[in-house]
Amino acid sequence: MKVQNLPYRLVLLALCVLLCSACSVNRQLARQADQLVARKQVSEVSCSGPQNCAMASPFHALLDEANRATSATQPIHFVNVLEQGEESLLMRIHLARAARHSIDIQTFIWVDDDAGRLMLDELLAAARRGVKVRIIADQLFSLEDAELLSRLAVIHRNLDIRIYNPTFHKAVTKPLEFAASILCCFKRFNQRMHNKLFLVDGELGIVGGRNYQNRYFDWDHSFDYRDRDVLVIGKDVGAQMTRSFEQFWNYKRSARLTRLNDVNSRIVAETDQGHDLPPAQISVDPARVDRLRVHASDADEMDRRFARHALRVGQVDYFSDLPHKLEGSANNHVLGERIAHMIRHAQSRIVLQTPYLVISKRAQKIFRDLRERENRPQVIVSTNSLAATDAFYVYALSHKYKKRYLKLGFWIYEFKPFPEDAPELIADYALLSGGTDSAGYQRYGQAPVTTQGVRVGMHAKSIVIDDTITLIGSHNFDPRSDNYNTESGFIIYDKAVSAAVTAAIERDIAPQNSWTIAKRPRTNLIHRFNNAIGDFSAALPLFDFWPFRFATSYELNDECAPLPPNHPDFYDCYTAVGDFPEVDLPLKTIYTRIVTAFGAGAVGIL
C-alpha cells in the first residue's frame, strides 16, 4: 500500500463505518423507547358509547342508503368531487369528527403549519374519544420535527403513526444524509409513497392530489395549488381502500416512531415529556382556522353544501400500487397498468390534467398507436406553465418534448400563474396577501414572475375517458409515478361525474386561465431548417442544445372566440406570447434551457 493513499483509504473507511451505523436501528434505544411509550401513553377515552360520541353527519345517511341499495351484482356509492382546497379540508375535519370507529390516513407530505396542525389536533381529539387513528406518512417531506414526533408517540394509545421508507432510520434527513442516501441506496431512496388516502370507518374515503400543507387548502399567502379530491361513500370500495391501507401499514418499510433513531433517542432523553404538542412551526392565520372549525361542526351546512349534491353512482374501483412495487413483477404496478388499459381503449376523447407533462416511453407508444387509428380520439391536456409550476426542472424536460406531444395529437393548455378565475378556484383569494409566509416542502423552486399577488399552480391529477370513465388520484402520469412512487386513485364509471370533472378542466383551460400551446407558423426556408435542427437536437438521448423551439405559447385576441390549435383560423385569433410568458428573470429562463439541454437522463426520477 502506498503511504500517500493511506489518508484517502482511512477517510473511505470512516465513511463506510458511518453509513453502516446509519443504516441500522439503535435497538437498545428502540427497546427503551418502546417501554417508555407503553408506560407513558394515555389510554383513557372521553366517551364510552358504541359510536365514540361521533358527531351527527348527513354522510351517515348517505352511507346507510348506499349500503342498503348495494347488491351482490350492483354496488352503489355516493360521490362528491372536491374542487376547492378549503372545502376539501373542511370535509376532512367534519368526517374526523363524525368518525365512529377508525380513521386511516396515507400522505406524501405533512407540514406542521395551520392546515397540518389543525388536522393533527382533530385526529388527536378523535383518538381521545375512542377512535382508532392510524397515519402513514412518507418520510422525505413529512413532520420533519423529531420533538413533535416524540410527543405524538406517547400522546395517546389510539393515535398510531408510522413513517414510510425513512432515510437512515431517521425522521429528519439532513442534506449530507440526503446525498449519501442517493449515492448508496438510489433505488430504495427514490421509491416514495405518493398515495393520498383519508378513510373513515372503512367506508368513507377521500382520495386525490392533496397533501397536508396550507398551499393544498387555499391557505398559503403566496402560492396555492389548483387541485382535486373526491369523496366516495360505500362499503364496496371501502373494502378495497381498507385492504390497500393494511398492506402498507404492515409493510417492512413502514416504521414505527420508536424505530427512528432521532425520535427514540428523544423519547428516552425527555423523562418529563408531557401530553401536549409543541407549538406549530408555522402559524399564518389562526382566525381562519377557528372559522373552519365552526363550519365543520355545522351538520346543516355540510348537508346544504355537499351531501345534497352527492352523485349516486354504481361501480367505483380503488386502485393502489403494492408497497413492494419495485421488488417484483409488473403486477405490482396496479394503478399504472389500469391507466394504460383505459387510455389504450379510449374511443372518442381523452381529457388529461397533470402538473407535469412528462410521459413515459410506454405511454408515448400507446398515444402513438391511438394517433394511427382511423377514428383516433381527441386528446386534451391541461398542465402547468413555467410561470405557474413549483417544479421548473420538470417543466424544462416537458419543454424538450413539446413537439413530440403535439405530433401525438395533444391539444396542450398551460395554466397561468394568475388565472382570471382564481377568485372562484381558490377560497377567499382576494383576502390572501400575496406575502411570503409559505414554508415547508417545495419541490424544485418556482420561477419569478412579472405580476404580484398569490400565484396558483396546477396540482390536479385526473383523466376522463370518453365522457364516461373518470380517474382521480395521485398519479402524475409521468415516469416517476410509473416506475418509482406508489400511487393510488379512484376510477369512477359514471357520466355525471365525468361531466363534472370535464367541466372543471375545461374551465381551467379556458383562455382567461391558460395559454394554448401550438406550433409556430411555417413561413420560410429558415423556419424549416430550424425545425430540422430542432428535431435532431430533441432526439438526442442526453443533450438538446437547440434553443429555437417548434412550438410556443399563444394568447387569445380580445375580438375572437376560443379556437382549438388545429383550427385554420387559429393564427388570426391568437398572438404568440413567447415560450415562457410572465417569467420575469432571464436567469430562470437560462436555467430552464440548461435543464432542457442536459436533463433528459433525469426524466425517470424528476
Language-model features and meaning:
Residues 2-11:
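Bacterial N-terminal signal peptides that target proteins for export
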Residues 11-21:
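Bacterial N-terminal signal peptides
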Residues 23-196, 200-606:
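Charged, low-complexity intrinsically disordered terminal segments
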